[in-house]
A protein has these predicted regions:
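Conserved acyl-donor/pantetheine-binding loop and adjacent beta-alpha core of acyl/acetyltransferases
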Residues: 83-120
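Conserved glycine-rich acetyl-CoA-binding loop
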Residues: 107-109, 114-133, 154-160
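Conserved beta-strand-loop-alpha-helix junction that forms the acyl-donor binding cleft
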Residues: 121-126, 138-139, 143, 148-159, ...
Length: 188
């Protein structure tokens, strides 16, 4: 499915992908990740980028419920993406968060939730609504009642975006904030 945006991000086309389509575009996706997270704000080191390319993304492609949105600019270049999958106990992120939050929060939020693993927008496309378009397009394609994600501290550029979409913090530790959104609750 493909949508042209009628907002400042209108120079981009959003497309929804399943695991096979995402795997076919892996080279472009990985280049976009490298470009997005090598900027001055994020400054992800080479080791972290290599881990994403060689281990994390290939592993995530195989997770149940994997779904992705990608954005291509008018030149056809992939300039952003967002993806997630069904989070379960026994997976790294779910277990990492579960060990750091109150058991009642764990029971309420984790296991069977849709987990947003990455939202990446290349620097030249930031501030135009593309991150919002990628995330909302992905969420609109999902039916899970709970969505969870983690971002850097509250001063992360993405934090206000998540809050504006109805995500609320339910964990705050190790320089990260864990946010969740119940789909049966309207977003702001």
């Amino acid at each position: 499915m493909s949508d042209s945006l009628g907002s400042p991000a209108s120079s981009c086309t959003i497309e929804q992908l399943g695991p096979d389509e995402a795997e076919a575009l892996a080279g472009e996706i990985l280049l976009s990740y490298r470009t997005a997270f090598s900027t001055s704000h994020w400054d992800t080191n080479e080791r972290g980028i290599k881990a994403f390319e060689e281990d994390i993304f290939p592993r995530h492609l195989k997770r149940e419920g994997f779904a992705m949105t990608v954005a291509h600019n008018t030149d056809g270049k992939l300039v952003g993406f967002c993806y997630g999958y069904i989070g379960e106990h026994g997976q790294y992120w779910t277990d990492y968060v579960a060990a750091r939050i109150h058991p009642s929060l764990e029971k309420s939020w984790l296991g069977g939730h849709f987990e947003i693993a990455e939202l990446a927008v290349e620097e030249e496309e930031r501030g135009k609504g593309l991150g919002r378009a990628l995330l909302t397009s992905l969420l609109d394609s999902r039916g899970e009642d709970r969505v969870a994600l983690m971002t850097l501290e509250r001063d992360s550029p993405a934090f206000p975006l998540y809050e504006s979409l109805g995500f609320t913090p339910f964990g705050d530790f190790d320089n990260y904030v864990v946010l969740g959104h119940r789909r049966d609750q309207p977003s702001a």
